[in-house]
Amino acid sequence: MKLDGVEIAIEKTNRRKTVSIFIERDGSVRVLAPVTATDDTIENAVRAKEYQIFAKLAKWKELNQGKVKRAFVNGQSFLYFGRNYRLSIEENQAVPLKLTGGYLRLDKKYLSKAEKVFKEFYREKAQQKIQERTKLIEDKFSTKPSSIKVLELRNRWASWTPKNRLTFHWKCAMAPVGVLDYIIMHEMVHLKYPSHSPAFWNELDKKMPDYRERENWLKQNGVKMAL
């Protein structure tokens, strides 16, 4: 459906009891609704939240004015677990990309496919760190994730499935560890509460009382977590 020219993606799922509206990381609007919800019910729910939708879209546009596009040249900075490291182009390096001596060092012969090399580097490092941090967090839960993967997700930092599989975006390797912990904790709470119900947020608040501060960092700086 469209709302004053804005395309809205609608997804029906048996995991929802009410209609929920989300502004995704790429600025798209997504509606999750129960499978029993009629088109009129969904449209009325969207219309009722029209002001909030456009207010959030305006905020998204404001934040995304700082969107970055990095060049693979000497001195360019790249985020790595919350810190900026400058790029150094090297010759005859044993591996395509490594972090050493305070620099991200890229072998010159991989310049033509630098973006692919960086994505794989971040994916591997995110996988390692997320496995490590999840082990520290999962003791607080009775249900454990059945698997953890790191991929390139379209418009989310992470996702879960009813089979308790967790998937994270490789860009999570750019976030500070404290913010990464929030992303993990958020998905872990979904293992108990599938939807963003009041019970979900209460549980998240109990498990991580300062989650709002970490979430806000992600909202304010997520646009900078890019190549």
Task: Cite the ranges covered by each PLM segment.
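Active-site-proximal or metal-binding-adjacent scaffold patches in catalytic folds
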Residues: 1-181, 191-227
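Walker B beta-strand of ABC/ABC-like P-loop ATPase nucleotide-binding domains
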Residues: 184
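Walker B catalytic acidic pair
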Residues: 187
